């Protein structure tokens, strides 16, 4: 069984921590002050594999936000993480034939960056939408991480096409933060909140935009290195990703924990223990999948509520309504009718 993605695994590139340290210095916070506040040893940046753990990086981000007094620090950091900050993957993206090829390469190998997200590209009605869903529970770090991810995706896309993206839209899975107006300064458009997932949408014609530095030989070399990195890091598929995929493959007929464990070739006890080490439970993962599917059905289909309830494995509409209200604070009908 592959090792589950967890908070103590050294998967986050040191380059991200260095970018954070450079940024907080501009707010008058020294490197040592940040390490002291975060209770993280400076030596973590000297790791021979060039990576640090999620736990250490999250501690640094928590303390950075507190010391800098900048609520939008995630957005600011995301704008600073240019192509070169993403290492070998960044070079491959820069050398791709066009933006579409660059995105395809990134989606194939983004796990070399130690991201705590599942990413996918959805093409529909003349638009290209990049979607991001947490592959591990980030808790209080969710907003900072999502801001950083989406801001860097947008900034790099603009850099690759050589101009600010036009007719772009962006959405986030959490309620609007107090600094929500700052999002328009970054993306050039007001963000949408309380979405089923984080997303960045642009006209699909951008995917054909050629790259000035296209180099097939460089892309091939980078692909070989990315394959080697994936094998070394063993992060091709984290445990939460595998559980979610299993549940999404069986909407309306979700397995219980023991059934899921058998399909994942492990024991129920082992699955429960691994999920606990990630700060979650099987029921919480199932509820999260149900919630995301419910939001998707309500926003993208006209299915009656009783059919949505059945698709989500509820015996009747009343149980679905109670669960949905617990998840969102709203009734399904009210959510669907909201502008």
Curated annotation (Swiss-Prot):
Domain HTH araC/xylS-type residues, every copy: 241-338
Keywords: Activator, DNA-binding, Transcription, Transcription regulation
Tagged with keyword Transcription: yes
Keyword Ribosomal protein among record annotations: no
InterPro entries in the cross-refs: AraC-type_N, Homeodomain-like_sf, HTH_AraC, Tscrpt_reg_AraC-type_HTH
Alphabetized Pfam families for the sequence: Arabinose_bd (PF12625), HTH_18 (PF12833)
Protein's job: Probably activates the ArgJ gene that encodes ornithine acetyltransferase. Binds to its own promoter-operator region. Probably binds ornithine.
Name assigned to this protein: Ornithine utilization regulator
